[in-house]
């Protein structure tokens, strides 16, 4: 086995998980004051649960309940992608809009990285009933990778991507996992968050639609 391939295999099997544990544990401690501030803001605007749990697809198409800061009203229809709601903005709270735009609603997933259900970098976990995305990911082996807080498809377009493109990017990641690739995605994520790149409430596939026009 060439040194490069051997190194990637070792990273994928051992080092990646070790880094997930170290970084998520540190993040939990450092970000705990921010967690409390966000929790208070959610409670003040729309009394109800601070966290939102939803059934998602994990590695090898197992399921788990992803955890986020609640960004939508308590009476929002469950298990429905935002882009399928007739009027997404109607359901999103004011603090929720800010959390979603800055991706701060995803922070509780640090705890799920620590527990091993997720990784820092990997394909974003699909809803259990996003059958089209799950089927497309099967073509590229992307369902056999631990889902991530951020991923290659996220930084390459996020909500702007159509299902086929999103699955293809997830497949590219699954076939090329390495320390260098993860670092690249991590820093690209920071840039995307600061620019609010790819966030389209109620939309999907906008990038391809623009190209066709």
Where are these regions (language model features)?
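Short, well-ordered beta-strand elements within core beta-sheets of diverse protein domains
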Residues: 95-102, 171-175
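Hydrophobic structural segments characteristic of membrane proteins
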Residues: 49, 111-213
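Short, conserved beta-strand/loop elements in beta-sheet-dominated catalytic cores
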Residues: 97-119
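A hydrophobic, helix-centered structural microdomain
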Residues: 2-75, 112, 179, 184-213
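Residue-level signal for the nucleotide or nucleotide-sugar donor/cofactor binding architecture
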Residues: 90, 102-105, 178
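Cytosolic-biased juxtamembrane loops and peripheral soluble domains of multi-pass membrane proteins
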Residues: 8, 76-94, 98, 124-131
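Short, glycine-rich, amphipathic interfacial segments at transmembrane boundaries or analogous
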Residues: 52-91, 149-169
């Amino acid at each position: 086995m060439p040194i490069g391939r051997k190194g990637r295999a070792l990273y994928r099997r051992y080092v990646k998980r070790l880094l997930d544990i170290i970084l998520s544990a540190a993040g939990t401690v450092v970000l705990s004051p921010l967690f409390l501030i966000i929790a208070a803001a959610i409670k003040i605007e729309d009394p109800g649960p601070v966290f939102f749990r939803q059934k998602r697809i994990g590695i090898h198409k197992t399921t788990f309940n992803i955890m986020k800061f609640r960004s939508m009203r308590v009476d929002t229809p469950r298990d429905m992608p935002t882009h399928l709601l007739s009027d997404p903005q109607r359901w999103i709270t004011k603090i929720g809009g800010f959390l979603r735009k800055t991706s701060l609603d995803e922070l509780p997933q640090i705890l799920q990285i620590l527990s091993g259900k997720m990784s820092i970098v990997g394909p974003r976990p699909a809803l259990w009933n996003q059958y089209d995305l799950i089927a497309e990911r099967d073509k590229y082996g992307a369902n056999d990778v631990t889902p991530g807080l951020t991923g290659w498809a996220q930084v390459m377009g996020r909500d702007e991507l159509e299902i086929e493109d999103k699955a293809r990017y997830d497949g590219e990641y699954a076939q090329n996992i390495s320390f260098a690739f993860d670092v690249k995605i991590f820093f690209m994520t920071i840039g995307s968050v600061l620019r609010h790149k790819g966030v389209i409430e109620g939309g999907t596939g906008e990038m391809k639609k623009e190209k066709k026009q």
